[in-house]
């Protein structure tokens, strides 16, 4: 069993996760989206790495219902093909939260006390407004162990 598979099994404590047999070398992490906390990401199988601009431009042709995460284009890492065959944008979760935190740190209203408060608020915003919302075509958010 490779290290990424072990990490994922430890993270979710769920032996029912179905890995693709013989594809351990292509396993690079998992994605989360509303209603599905663990979508395994396999390079060149269900993950197509693209630049942010290419991913956003091409997704409109592939899946007109696909949605973007406003203001976070720099965190797009490509497309994720879901089990139902639809394709959605895939964002790097850490990068997205870091962008949110940076925006909070630039806030001059006095709403945030310090860097830790900004980080906590960024994670809260992510869980409530990104991961916690459902609409058709919502993006997925990747936790990558290897690129």
Task: Go through each PLM region and give its residues.
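C-terminal alpha-helical interaction appendages
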Residues: 6-147
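Short, Lys/Arg-enriched, disordered terminal segments
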Residues: 1-2
């Amino acid at each position: 069993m490779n290290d990424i598979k072990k990490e994922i099994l430890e993270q979710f404590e769920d032996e029912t996760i179905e890995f693709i047999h013989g594809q351990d070398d292509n396993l690079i992490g998992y994605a989360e989206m509303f209603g599905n906390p663990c979508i395994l990401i396999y390079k060149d199988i269900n993950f197509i790495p693209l630049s942010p601009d290419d991913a956003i431009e091409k997704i409109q042709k592939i899946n007109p219902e696909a949605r973007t995460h406003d203001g976070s284009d720099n965190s797009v890492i490509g497309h994720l093909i879901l089990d139902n065959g639809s394709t959605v944008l895939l964002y790097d979760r850490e990068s997205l939260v870091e962008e949110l935190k940076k925006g909070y740190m630039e806030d001059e209203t006095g709403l945030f006390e310090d860097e830790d408060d900004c980080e906590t608020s960024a994670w809260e915003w992510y869980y409530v407004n990104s991961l916690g919302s459902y609409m058709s075509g919502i993006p997925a958010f990747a936790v990558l162990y290897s690129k």
